[in-house]
């Protein structure tokens, strides 16, 4: 039947008249649908004319609901004439809670439609969130009204009980629907005021329930009450929304990334601040989901493994100091920081110990194998030493210290107890003994120079005996006093410069102080890098010499520029003095002037030798005369010769190499007796020269023992690159952790070949694994190794390797699960680590990190023995490894910076290009796994990355990957719901996902 449309009557009025006629004539649902479509404009929703409002007004006019109108309402919903949002919003306005029959009818209607709630248009999406909040609030009001009635009458009528039961059923359906919970969660951000009222109403219901003695009815077989459902909705958080976990459930039993990470930090960033370690370890904890106790245990275990690997080497003292002095400081800092960040976890602030530390030692005791091995290796009870250091930092008290130590007593009864006065050889004991001397040296260095010259000389030279200097440096480094120590030595060296007219004992003492302080400073710079220990802007003699004349790795310096800086008149005078019988004793040049002009001297001597103006014997005598006066002269000469050897041909290397070798030959006993502490100074001189030889001479080191003794990172090797890597990786697989020598070799490969080559080789090792356990283990080790230069390696992985794998340019098999999942996890770990990497001066530098002077030099001569690699193996990023500022609060997401931001944008655009068909391929599933792991592992920290995802990527992926892996929790975690655009995109994706699910369910039916 078609109704006559009068121009003067609005369509809303027409709809109301139509409703009355439909009721009078008892239209069927089909008749109603036909006639109402004649009134509504094609393509226009009935919401525009308040159709849902009109129907519901007529449906609940009397004491009972009109089922005919409710059937019209349901038909209109099914025919998409009105939206679910409009219906829910209108129902939530009904406030006649005493009309039990109407309430029951409305609740039954809700129960029948709530499972199919969705959106069909953009306008509806914005309304549905508030409508769902209003509906939940309305249900809570009904329930509260029932409890109030019970409180007054001490009982409920049959109708009231049915209202409570129906309310519970609707709430149950809402809570059991992830889509509806997701809509409520979005509404929490869309209308915080209404959600606040909802949360407040929940508390009121809780209090009223307790006060009235009302027993909440059990809704399901799981003994869940209405109050439980209300509480779940009112306290909804991200964790409430389910997500498919690709990273596995629970915490992994064994972690393989901590030991390689600590090994890399110890070797290449020894002067790192405690807070930098704290941020790095907390980042690993968040990625792995460790509790603090597990984190502490893993740190200690990793350090003990590293210490075992370096026994008997020059690095042993530093790693020992790091383990027993630095680690307690790090744990103390983590303890304090976590108390600030998570105060609820530390309710009892009066504890004189950390329960996490106690639990960490309990976990450590379970790994008795490494403890037994280290006790025997270090000739001490390592647990007892660690406990004593923890006591100093108030991380554990006497009671628990004794309890934990007692558990090891039975095993270590044959070992000597901790006693610093015993003569038993123990590196741990020696390291701890080095703390008091360090304090004394720093105090003396800060005293009046004129009053402590002899005492200072004796103290410094005594330190040079044995390995005391390395012990002192190790302790100074881990305690953060290395810069203070260096500043004191520079001050001493500056004060010890030659004073005209000074004679006798004072002059000899001053000369020895100048020499020994210079040697010690060179040794420190050689091992710790000039950036980490020297201060910018200062102009002392030593710092000027380091900047202009000292050869350093990754800092090319032109030897000819050094020659140009020399004063030719002083060079000539120096030559005359060395040719005289008295040698340098008769020269008027000051010590510091000789050091500065040695490059010019050696250049002329080399030219004379090559032109056969001087014989080999004369050269030897010449060099012996130079080195006999001061040891620092040998260092200055060797430094220039090493720089000079970088620019000459292979057939010209022999003469400068022989000159360097002459500086390490023994001197006569008579000369040894003429100068104070010459033996100690010569010992340090030989160490410095040997390291320069290994680092800068263009010949491979044949003796592994020599490379093990010296901290060499020589790029020179006779073996092909592939063989070097395979040999290193074979050792890693055999041990299950990263040996120190392997770490150095991998750093060499990174510097030689660039990050792409190394990352490619590392990722290939994951694909060689047969079992998931092996894949995860290898992935952990690969992730840690990439911290050699985490930014550049991450960029190489994301911008080069992953796109090439997707395009199959590497001619490898298809990226399929579980390989794709492990690769995606590696990508996510690297993204988070790069974002959160602290900004510190570091020795992990790229070959591009050289001065302009070096750039000019490289145009003349390439770095010796550098392999020529194809363009595909070169790194696209040549920038220095510069990290961003350290964040004060971990809960604030680290901002994305270039080049990571641009790299991720390009990667996501690449993903969009692949999603062009409706076919689910392994490549598309890898993209989904990557995004899922981003939100699963990265959580709130990854928000800046998620903002880069192109619009439409998720919806296109949902249309293809409409599997159980796609969840509401995943979708909502992708967006920042604090922003209007984030909520809009989230609701759009949610509704599309809902409609896809409903279509699948209808097909199954």
UniProtKB/Swiss-Prot annotation:
Can you list the GO cellular component terms from the UniProt entry?
A: mediator complex
Membrane-spanning residues where? none
Signal sequence residues: none
Q: Name one Pfam family in it.
A: Med24_N
One GO MF term: transcription coregulator activity
Which GO annotations describe the biological process of this protein?
positive regulation of transcription initiation by RNA polymerase II
Keywords, sorted A to Z = Activator, Nucleus, Repeat, Transcription, Transcription regulation
Give its localization. Nucleus
Assembly:
Component of the Mediator complex.
Family to which this protein belongs = Belongs to the Mediator complex subunit 24 family.
Role according to the record: Component of the Mediator complex, a coactivator involved in the regulated transcription of nearly all RNA polymerase II-dependent genes. Mediator functions as a bridge to convey information from gene-specific regulatory proteins to the basal RNA polymerase II transcription machinery. Mediator is recruited to promoters by direct interactions with regulatory proteins and serves as a scaffold for the assembly of a functional preinitiation complex with RNA polymerase II and the general transcription factors.
User: Which PANTHER family does the entry mention?
Assistant: MEDIATOR OF RNA POLYMERASE II TRANSCRIPTION SUBUNIT 24 (PTHR12898:SF1)
- Protein name as catalogued: Mediator of RNA polymerase II transcription subunit 24
Q: Which gene encodes it?
A: MED24
